[in-house]
């Protein structure tokens, strides 16, 4: 409990101090390849204290690995999440049990993804329903400190196989970039296809080094319920109304009910328009997955004013997919008589280069 209170107090202090112009230049991009660092430094210098903003994906972009995809089996391993506790609305298919294998929620999630990612993306945020934000914050911190692979069993091509998943591993380079941007008066937003509340527990907690403002974390939204009064809300609605109460929200319970914004695929670009700024584009966008981050990378960056795209090249098959997309997009722009920007200003780095 004391740790959670310290998190909230530190988050408020970080929000007040990180953007102070007196800190400009305090952070250096030491964990970036020299060429990439030079480009980013020039971008920051030319946009410092001019009302600019940047948008980053979280999982596999701002840290290595995936928060929800490790938290789910971690909480199953601890007995916190079980099939019996799963909200009935989330039991979309029969569980696939055998005499040797009682299917786990993690295996069930993978089978949801086999239907379509648009099914499993929301499901893996909804699966944590029934827990309070205070409980979830404690579990997220426990996961982040775990530092060991988490064993999993799941179906692959009809057979049960064993594997492991890793808890998130902080990218030092992204910590530096988040802080340098904010120190130079450039707002940093997180646009995640994961649960907004879960990601906020990492990126807005100063002990993890990003110092993002909790209000600037945008992700999959689930209604929060006050079990004493029955009142429904979300952090995003509170932020929109200027009534965000992070401390009070810790006692609220996550429900399985989805509401806008829905921040996956083209929804990330739509959320920039609807929840950040309809007309002003970000000067920097970061991502790692073509279909999930591609729309905001291609359509969201103000390239004509020097804006840049950071691509974390973490999977061999994704790089040619993204490159093909930006080449096709550039041809489409040219055919339409538009400024050809889709293939411009890409900064490509590998995970180990920013670790």
What positions do the PLM features span?
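C-terminal cap/substrate-recognition subdomain and adjoining C-terminal extension
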Residues: 27-39, 45-47, 51-53, 138-189, ...
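A generic alpha-helix surface/boundary motif
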Residues: 66, 118-119, 197, 266
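Charge-dense, intrinsically disordered terminal/linker segments
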Residues: 1-2, 192
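A metal-dependent, Asp-based hydrolase signature
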Residues: 68-70, 75-76, 80-165
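Non-catalytic pre-domain segments flanking phosphatase-related domains
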Residues: 2-14, 22-58, 66, 71-93
């Amino acid at each position: 409990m004391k740790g959670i209170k310290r998190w909230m107090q530190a988050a408020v202090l970080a929000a007040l101090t990180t953007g102070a112009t007196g800190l400009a230049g305090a952070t250096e991009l030491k964990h970036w390849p020299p060429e990439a660092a030079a480009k980013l430094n020039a971008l920051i210098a030319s946009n410092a204290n001019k009302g600019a903003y940047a948008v980053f994906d979280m999982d596999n972009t701002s840290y290595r690995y995936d928060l929800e995809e490790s938290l789910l089996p971690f909480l199953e391993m601890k007995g916190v999440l079980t099939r019996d506790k799963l909200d009935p609305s989330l039991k979309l298919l029969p569980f696939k049990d055998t005499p040797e294998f009682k299917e786990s929620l993690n295996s069930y999630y993978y089978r949801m993804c086999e239907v379509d990612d648009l099914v499993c993306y929301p499901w893996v945020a909804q699966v944590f329903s029934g827990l309070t934000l205070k409980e979830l914050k404690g579990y997220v911190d426990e996961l982040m400190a775990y530092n060991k692979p988490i064993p999993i069993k799941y179906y692959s091509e009809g057979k049960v196989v064993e594997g492991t998943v890793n808890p998130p591993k902080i990218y030092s380079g992204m910590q530096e970039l988040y802080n340098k941007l904010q120190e130079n008066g450039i707002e940093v937003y997180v646009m995640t296809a994961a649960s907004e509340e879960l990601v906020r527990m990492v990126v807005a907690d100063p002990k993890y080094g990003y110092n993002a403002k909790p209000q600037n974390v945008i992700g999959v939204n689930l209604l929060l319920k006050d079990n004493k009064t029955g009142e429904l809300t979300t952090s995003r609605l509170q932020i929109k109304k200027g009534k965000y109460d992070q401390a009070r929200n810790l006692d609220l319970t996550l429900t399985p009910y989805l509401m806008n914004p829905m921040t996956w695929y083209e929804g990330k670009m739509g959320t920039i328009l609807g929840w950040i700024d309809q007309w002003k584009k970000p000067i920097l966008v970061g991502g790692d997955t073509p279909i999930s981050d591609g729309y905001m990378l291609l359509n969201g960056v103000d390239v004509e004013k020097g804006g840049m795209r950071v691509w974390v090249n973490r999977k061999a098959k994704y790089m040619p997919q993204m490159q093909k997309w930006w080449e096709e997009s550039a041809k489409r722009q040219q055919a339409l008589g538009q400024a050809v920007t889709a293939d411009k200003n890409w900064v490509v780095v590998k995970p180990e280069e920013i670790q």
